[in-house]
């Protein structure tokens, strides 16, 4: 009888404990999923915040790395998880996400400044652990495409073949209604794809900015060839449409019109393809290429960007460094001097690169930035000025006269493809091609 009573007491106590635990669990409410406008305020420093469409940019000056780290802990305690961390020289970058929101933080110790970018979660860039593929040991190459458009002698289109035979495309060029340039791009992809490939695979299409001479080819390519290629993801970060209306209402055959066509193509032809908004500090892994984003337009705030100041699309260009096949390529788009000076100011030895793209077809430049990059090879996108730009401006003259620059390659007269890594013999190249023979329309 005593044993039976003991068993009953144990069962009653067990049920009570289980019930208490259940009640405790049921009473524990899940944390609220914080949206873009619900984030806790950064706890220190002098704060300045700007709303850009669906994105909030907060710049906190007079802060320390401990403040940056403490805010990360605050976000983690509020239901965020760390998506990625990156370190470039002494600068720290962290991306955190929840189901609704992405937060991108940076800390630049030279200015004791923390920047917080909050936006809807959207599609995310590929990290190292996401970059799963099988290399085919195919020679990586870099191709600069000559544009054929008669609208304007401007444009930029680069094609990088990766070691599995897929591609990264950067911009594309002006394009034209006759689809000459988009057909040229498609033919390059077909010719450089592995034998037997039914559809060329574009692992990433990156747009430096939204001017028509950079996105125009994409628009016509999408109409003619969207179902003849496979595209895995798009990467870009354009300024607001309001800025475009203020600064770029007419530029090289109406960039606003071309941007509207760009949006239409994205919606109509690629509704399910990820569209990643990339930011300063993102490290993107695409096959055997690793890309560090060094500058995106949010960092124009507050000096060149606020409720009254609107940057041009050139000023909003991305700057990023591609590491591939043991070499590095610095891409600048049409960036203006402010952006070049920004990366020169905040980055140190990491700017050194083997290949440099001259900014804005050679029309924007910075001696400090170019000398920090200190390239061995220089690429000049399609330019109405041709090689004349090498005689204009201290930055371009520095590149022209630098003893470390072995070759300047331009794409105004022809498409050019080089292997990566690129290490030609001196006998195979000339630093500046002989204008009187190779470029008869140009007198150097």
Language-model segment annotations:
Residues 1-4:
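Positively charged n-region of N-terminal signal peptides that target proteins for export
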Residues 18-20:
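C-terminal motif of bacterial Sec signal peptides marking the signal peptidase cleavage site
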Residues 25-61, 119-126:
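Compositionally biased P/S/T/G-rich terminal and signal peptide-adjacent segments
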Residues 45-51, 97-128, 225:
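Amphipathic N-proximal alpha-helical interface segments
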Residues 62-84:
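Amphipathic alpha-helical segments
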Residues 122-200, 275-352, 418-444:
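Core dinuclear metal-dependent hydrolase active-site scaffold
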Residues 133, 233, 239-292, 298-300, ...:
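Binuclear metal-ion centers of metallo-dependent hydrolases, dominated by the metallo-beta-lactamase
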Residues 165, 178-236, 241, 346-363, ...:
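Active-site metal-binding motif and surrounding structural segment of the metallo-beta-lactamase
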């Amino acid at each position: 009888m005593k044993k039976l009573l003991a068993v009953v007491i144990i069962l009653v106590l067990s049920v009570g404990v289980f019930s208490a635990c259940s009640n405790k669990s049921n009473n524990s409410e899940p944390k609220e999923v914080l949206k873009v406008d619900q984030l806790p305020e950064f706890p220190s420093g002098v704060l300045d915040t700007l709303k850009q469409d669906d994105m909030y940019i907060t710049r906190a000056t007079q802060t320390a790395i401990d403040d940056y780290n403490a805010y990360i802990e605050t976000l983690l305690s509020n239901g965020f998880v760390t998506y990625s961390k990156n370190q470039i020289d002494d600068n720290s970058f962290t991306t955190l996400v929840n189901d609704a929101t992405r937060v991108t933080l940076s800390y630049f110790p030279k200015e004791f400044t923390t920047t917080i970018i909050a936006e809807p979660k959207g599609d995310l860039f590929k990290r190292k652990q996401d970059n799963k593929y099988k290399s085919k040991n195919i020679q990586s190459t870099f191709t600069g495409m000559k544009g054929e458009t008669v609208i304007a002698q401007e444009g930029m289109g680069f094609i990088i073949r990766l070691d599995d035979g897929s591609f990264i495309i950067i911009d594309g060029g002006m394009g034209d209604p006759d689809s000459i340039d988009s057909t040229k791009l498609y033919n390059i992809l077909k010719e450089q794809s592995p034998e037997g490939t039914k559809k060329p695979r574009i692992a990433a299409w990156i747009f430096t900015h939204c001017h028509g001479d950079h996105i125009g080819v994409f628009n016509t390519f999408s109409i003619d060839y969207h179902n003849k290629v496979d595209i895995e993801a798009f990467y870009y970060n354009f300024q607001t449409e309001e800025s475009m209306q203020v600064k770029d209402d007419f530029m090289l055959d109406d960039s606003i019109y071309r941007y509207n066509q760009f949006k239409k193509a994205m919606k109509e032809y690629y509704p399910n393809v990820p569209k990643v908004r990339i930011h300063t500090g993102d490290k993107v892994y695409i096959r055997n290429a690793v890309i560090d984003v060094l500058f995106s337009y949010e960092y124009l705030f507050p000096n060149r960007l606020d409720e009254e100041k609107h940057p041009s699309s050139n000023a909003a260009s991305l700057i990023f460094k591609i590491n591939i096949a043991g070499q590095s390529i610095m891409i600048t788009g049409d960036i203006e001097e402010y952006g070049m000076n920004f990366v020169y100011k905040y980055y140190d030895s990491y700017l050194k690169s083997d290949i440099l793209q001259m900014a804005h077809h050679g029309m924007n430049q910075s001696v400090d930035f170019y000398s920090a990059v200190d390239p061995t090879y220089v690429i000049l996108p399609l330019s109405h000025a041709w090689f004349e730009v090498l005689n204009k401006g201290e930055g371009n003259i520095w590149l022209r006269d630098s003893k470390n620059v072995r070759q300047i390659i331009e794409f105004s007269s022809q498409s050019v493809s080089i292997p990566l890594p690129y290490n030609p013999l001196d006998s195979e190249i000339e630093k500046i091609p002989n204008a009187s023979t190779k470029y008869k329309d140009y007198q150097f």
